[in-house]
Amino acid sequence: MPTIFRSLSTTQLIKSLRTSSGAGMMECKQALLECGNNLDEALDWLRKYGSAKATQKTAGRENSEGQVSVLMKSDYKSCTTMTVKSETDFASRSDLFTKFVEDVTNRVNTNTSSTTQKTFTEAELLAMTDVKTCLDEAMVSIRENLQLSSATQTTVQQDSNFLNYYIHNKAPSSDWVGQIAAIVEIASSSPSPSPPSPDQLEIGRKLAMHVAAAKPSYATIEQIPTSTIEKEKEIMLEQMKDTNKPPEVMEKIVNGKLRKFYEENVLEEQGHMVEAENPKIKSFLKSQGLSLVNFVLHSIK
């Protein structure tokens, strides 16, 4: 046994290991027994076998709770977003879980390029050694089967564009972790300062708030697949087939229903829920010399 550990009693060793790992007393006792009371080796043992044990004990349980995060770069040109799931809201609402989400998001962020546009699979995330280590440590401490559900690196499509985000139901101990995360990409008709101006950032933040509340399906009409629009038209025409209305009247009705469909599903076509007088988002952004490029929405439920 290393000299530094010889002066500590078994009780003190267990207490020290519990403090550093967050594992239970019996797990710590077993780890020390397996590693000859070597604290460093016992901590590694817990990382390897403690997380595996947690996975075995909770196999088959649904990971329906959790948190999402948005780590934005200081120039507002790229960000890393993660969805991390737990079994219970008791775990997901704890400061320990929030700290884990922040740590693992930071580690994913350092493993990716700021010029990358990519969604990572769980397997790709676990292949990052420091990310896997972070997960193993958290599973020992939190004692639930945690899941790195998804991670996305979002980067502006042009240098003149900028991003901003909004977190709904923030965790008490974090400004960038919560239950819903919305990110918007906005283009400027003139060269955008880097970082964007406070006014531009506020416009982006409010638009992201709208996204979190309205949960649109598309950013622009152009993003809707032609097959989706044709299917909607077929449904509308089927609903009117027994009305004996003239074709030109039916066409007007279909166009009106399509406008309503766009207003319900397309971000640009919606009334802005956060701006005064609820202007149409496309028109409002145009009045500010801006236009919508895209949005991303992550939600636990």
Task: Please name every model-derived segment.
Residues 2-301:
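N-terminal assembly/interaction segments in proteins that build large macromolecular machines
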